[in-house]
Amino acid sequence: MNRHTKIRQAVLARLREECGECATFFDGLPAFIDAQELPAVAVWLSDARYTGKMTDEDDWQAVLHIAVFIRAQAPDSELDKWMENSIYPALRHIPALSGLIDTMTPQGFNYQRDDEMATWAMAEITYQIAYTN
């Protein structure tokens, strides 16, 4: 199995433990989210690139995205509750990642709303991860 798939699956498994059956989970950034699928949690990677830090190793880094989607009418404080009570606590300790990545460093936090269909509001936390193939 591809390392990126294993990373996403490890994070999703931990989030499922923390959130239970109260959300729909996506392996990757969904192209479309139906209102019936909300709340939803998505995990995806972007900007994967070779770092070349060690001459004799295959060092890589990528951005790990974890996002929660809720109904567009909900206030940002509802997104904050999701992040603070479910998402962030789950991300503090993911034992399954220990053999897959070397480091996981918080990078940023973002809010976004669906401008086209007004279906969802999203909060996203990103981490810089480093790993060796």
Cite the ranges covered by each PLM segment.
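A short glycine-rich, His/Asp/Glu-containing loop-to-beta-strand
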Residues: 38-43
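Charged, amphipathic alpha-helical segments and their flanking helix caps
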Residues: 1-33, 45-133
